[in-house]
Regions:
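Noncatalytic alpha-helical scaffold of FAD-dependent oxidoreductases
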Residues: 2-448
């Protein structure tokens, strides 16, 4: 997408006082995702400024999808007919200090919310590796950070408002709706248009992060649980070569009375002497501060700074979740494929996520370890490697990240979600004519 994207709207595009219509997208503009690997199947794009406008637009379309921050690498958010943007619905609506919740428009980005919360003395429990993503999109796909005691980002959701296919507004909350709420939080875009989200918050806190280099894989095999439990959030970066983890990122909360001195060694890895990028050859200028320098939670939990592009964007991503109890076996299984993986890989990241109770979450009722791959943008090669990885991870019933690339057969994927039959019934209840279904959902949830 050109720098003058649809997000930078001029007043000349306003069709009426009530609706900002972008249907006359210029013919030479191709609507793509952030990475540039996916060209969306339509350029028809309308914009809503209010809940009432969302209702009007939804009722008027036979088929539609919401276009968010476009950080998914597959077609989960694609449409062949019509997009709606909520970019002008990006406000923090209220902060309840007593209840410790914040309510926001669903299109708000984590980075923007974080600065607001910190200024008010509050924080979120966790963030993803980059803060440029929308809250609605991240929760819908069970996007996560790391930490053995940290659930994915959706676990902070206390309530949500969504517009159903008939234009009805439905509000669900953890306190009042129980299983119906847990069914809908990770909704994959298949239930309606989420317009408002309430998140749990906690008192703000400071963090520091240290990076260690060259952790022997043998140490990881012997001490995986101890390594992953050694800080509030831990990330392991590896290229699967030389029998080692290239970098270990330890993100710890600053606690009163706790020493800030870092050990020179960590399970055989050496303390870094300068800030590093997860891919060591790249500049760390766009990464969050390291070297034990204390700072706000939102400037340490992500790997990348809000004000910088996390990378060139020309990449592909895949990720697989396995039960935490099988972590070492799964890592060794992937390592056996190193000669197939490495020619196409930029870097892999290994993270931990606590269990949750959301029907379509990869971490449903299981504490998980996620093995992530950032690939060079060569889909022809990557799609040959993914089946090899999926075969090696099959004994652990690995579940792919909903917003990243995978090649699992639909029936295999479906078998790994025990609540899928009930979720499909819920989709039929909320959206009887399939207004919010698309090719991705049709294939992966309903395909044979």
């Amino acid at each position: 997408v050109k720098k003058r994207t649809f997000l930078k709207l001029s007043s000349s595009l306003l069709a009426t006082p009530s609706l900002s219509t972008l249907a006359n997208w210029m013919a030479d503009e191709k609507l793509k995702n952030w990475a540039g690997n996916l060209q969306y199947s339509t350029t028809r794009l309308d914009q809503a400024k209010s809940l009432q406008q969302v209702q009007k637009l939804v009722k008027g379309y036979e088929k539609m999808k919401v276009l968010g921050t476009r950080h998914c690498f597959n077609g989960i958010a694609d449409s062949t007919t019509q997009f709606v943007s909520l970019v002008e619905m990006s406000q923090v609506l209220s902060l309840d200090a007593k209840a410790k919740t914040v309510t926001v428009d669903a299109n708000v980005k984590y980075g923007d919310l974080a600065t607001y919360l910190d200024a008010k003395g509050f924080a979120l429990h966790n963030l993803a590796s980059l803060p440029h993503i929308s809250i609605a999109g991240a929760c819908a796909t069970a996007t996560h950070g790391s930490g053995v005691k940290n659930g994915n980002l959706a676990t902070a959701v206390a309530a949500m408002e969504l517009v159903l296919a008939n234009g009805e507004v439905r509000t669900l909350s953890r306190a009042k709706d129980g299983e119906a709420f847990r069914a809908a939080v990770v909704h994959l875009g298949g239930l309606g248009v989420v317009t408002k989200i309430t998140l749990d918050v906690q008192p703000t806190f400071q963090m520091r992060q240290y990076v260690y280099e060259n952790l022997p894989m043998a140490q990881l095999k012997e001490h995986f649980d101890a390594i992953e439990s050694s800080a509030y959030s831990v990330s392991l970066f590896t290229d699967w070569q030389k029998n080692r983890v290239n970098e270990v990122w330890l993100k710890e909360r600053v606690e009163k009375g706790k020493t800030a001195a870092a050990k020179p060694e960590f399970y055989g890895a050496k303390l870094a002497t300068k800030n590093l990028h997860p891919i060591a050859e790249l500049s760390a200028v766009n990464c969050t501060a390291q070297m034990g320098v204390a700072g706000p939670w939102y400037e340490r939990l992500p790997h990348f700074r809000m004000g910088f592009t996390p990378s060139s964007g020309k990449e592909l991503q895949s990720e697989y979740f396995v039960p935490a109890r099988n972590a070492v076996e799964a890592i060794l299984a992937v390592e056996r494929l190193r000669d197939h993986i490495s020619p196409h890989l930029m870097i892999s990241e290994i993270r931990t996520i606590d269990a949750d109770s959301f029907w379509m979450s990869p971490c449903y009722k299981q504490a998980s370890v996620a093995i992530h791959f950032t690939w060079k943008q060569d889909w022809a090669s990557v799609k040959k490697v993914l089946p090899m990885i999926e075969k090696e991870l099959a004994p652990f019933k690995a579940r792919p990240h909903w917003g990243k690339l995978f090649t699992l057969a639909p029936v295999t994927l479906q078998s790994r979600y025990e609540k899928l039959p009930e979720f499909k019934k819920l989709m039929a209840d909320y959206d009887p004519k399939g207004k919010f279904r698309n090719a991705f959902l049709d294939m992966n949830l309903f395909g044979k």
